[in-house]
Amino acid sequence: MKKIFTALLCVAAANAMADDAAIKRKLQSFNISNIVIKSSPISGIKTAVTDQGILYVSEDGKYLFEGKLYELTNNGPVDVAGKILVDKLNSYKDEMIVYPAKNEKHVVTVFMDITCHYCHLLHQQLKEYNDLGITVRYLAFPRAGMNNQTAKQMEAIWTAKDPVFALNEAEKGNLPKEVKTPNIVKKHYELGIQFGVRGTPSIVTSTGELIGGYLKPADLLRALEETAQ
């Protein structure tokens, strides 16, 4: 009986892999790239993590939809895509520019652009965020994409010997004199697209929830405490 059960599991796994491969081929035919097929919390629906963002596909590959998918919990709606991507987000921790809170209560990751007014405003208030127990981690998200000077300047900042100093200087208007091909920045940008980032700053909680744009320190703390309940 145990051997039969194991064999059935193997057949089911093989069928699932075959279905995933078929879905992948179908998406590739529409020029969707770097596809990873995952399960979803909805029966009959698969999650496709792609360079173009998170997509949801029926198991037969006939239907596709894009947009936010929320799990309705007792504490309110939770973005499913963020939960899927949070491990990938944290795998970039060594590439983040981090401003740690001494008495850390919350950690947020901010997709930022050095030309963004509200990013400047957020950066100017870092001490206030830190004093409230909020650690801020930055990832690069040049709003104009990869083929521009800002992306190259941000690459120089993120790969500097002292990235914190380099970013602080850039925020004062002292931009890098030498620029670099945006390799790390490209990874950050693509992750931002997967999260659904459309502008900066975009704030992501430790659970992968995308809060949105700039929030004053006290307002951000309130939002984080509400999502943590």
Curated annotation (Swiss-Prot):
Span of the signal peptide: 1-18
Keyword Signal on entry: yes
Main subcellular localisation: periplasm
Xref: CDD domains: DsbA_DsbC_DsbG
Record key words, sorted: Disulfide bond, Periplasm, Redox-active center, Signal
A cellular-component GO term for this protein: periplasmic space
Top-level lineage group: Bacteria
Protein localization: Periplasm
Function comment: Required for disulfide bond formation in some periplasmic proteins. Acts by transferring its disulfide bond to other proteins and is reduced in the process. DsbC is reoxidized by a yet uncharacterized protein. Also acts as a disulfide isomerase.
Subunit structure: Homodimer.
The name this protein goes by in its record: Thiol:disulfide interchange protein DsbC
Upper taxonomic lineage: Bacteria, Pseudomonadati, Pseudomonadota, Gammaproteobacteria, Pasteurellales
Originating gene: dsbC
